[in-house]
């Protein structure tokens, strides 16, 4: 289902953790806004459950999407997201997520959004629900998603290692050439040695 749950009159949390479309990119959350319900943005309406896929309906090419894992009970997301809840008996949410975040689908959704009549590129949740998808058996979906998830984890690890190495190189450069230049080193013009 899409957008199955929203805040209603019986919503019992006074404080919410709000996620807007600009605070998540390619599954990475930059942060939540903790806010009292009475002061929440007007778009703070969508409720999410574990393994729901959130996909921004505005400018799909910006890749504001993610999959919800172990949400706090008071997590609320923007109505700018389509919230997709998978039928766990038939589909693996991670498989659907990888499908929806593939370049081919993102580019297709961006093309549809660009053709919209609104003031900015956007699409309706119906566009997402009407995408054709090949569904292997549930065990195959889980296997495919597991492999892709493992590759994503390795890519994330490599990015973190690169950041660490860049920081180390910068520190060593500063230490060797700025802070602790050897007394015996001669100062000269670069043009004299090249």
Regions found by a protein language model. Name each.
Residues 1-53, 68, 191-194:
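Sequence-specific dsDNA recognition surfaces
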Residues 1-10, 130, 134-194:
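Non-catalytic DNA-recognition/assembly elements of restriction-modification systems
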Residues 21, 86, 133-135:
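Hydrophobic residues in beta-strands and at strand termini
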Residues 44-105, 118, 124-125:
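A short beta-sheet element
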Residues 56, 82, 97-101, 110, ...:
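Generic alpha-helical structural context detector
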Residues 75-80, 116-145:
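A short glycine-rich beta-alpha junction/loop motif
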Residues 101, 106, 111, 132-134:
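Well-ordered mid-protein domain cores that form the structural environment of catalytic cofactors
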């Amino acid at each position: 289902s899409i957008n199955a749950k929203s805040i209603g009159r019986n919503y019992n949390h006074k404080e919410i953790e709000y996620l807007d479309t600009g605070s998540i990119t390619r599954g990475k959350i930059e942060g939540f806004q903790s806010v009292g319900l009475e002061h929440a943005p007007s778009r703070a309406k969508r409720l999410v459950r574990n393994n729901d896929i959130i996909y921004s309906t505005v400018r799909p090419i910006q890749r504001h999407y993610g999959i919800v894992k172990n949400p706090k009970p008071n997590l609320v997301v923007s109505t700018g997201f389509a919230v997709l809840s998978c039928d766990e008996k038939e589909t693996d949410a991670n498989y659907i997520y990888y499908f929806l975040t593939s370049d081919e689908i993102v580019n297709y959704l961006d093309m549809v959004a660009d053709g919209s009549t609104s003031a900015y590129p956007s699409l309706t949740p119906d566009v997402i629900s009407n995408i054709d998808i090949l569904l292997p058996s549930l065990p195959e979906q889980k296997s495919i998603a597991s492999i892709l998830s493992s590759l994503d984890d390795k890519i994330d690890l490599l990015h973190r290692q690169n950041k660490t190495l860049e920081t180390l190189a910068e520190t060593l450069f500063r230490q060797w050439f700025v802070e602790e230049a050897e007394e015996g080193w001669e100062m000269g013009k670069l043009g004299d040695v090249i």
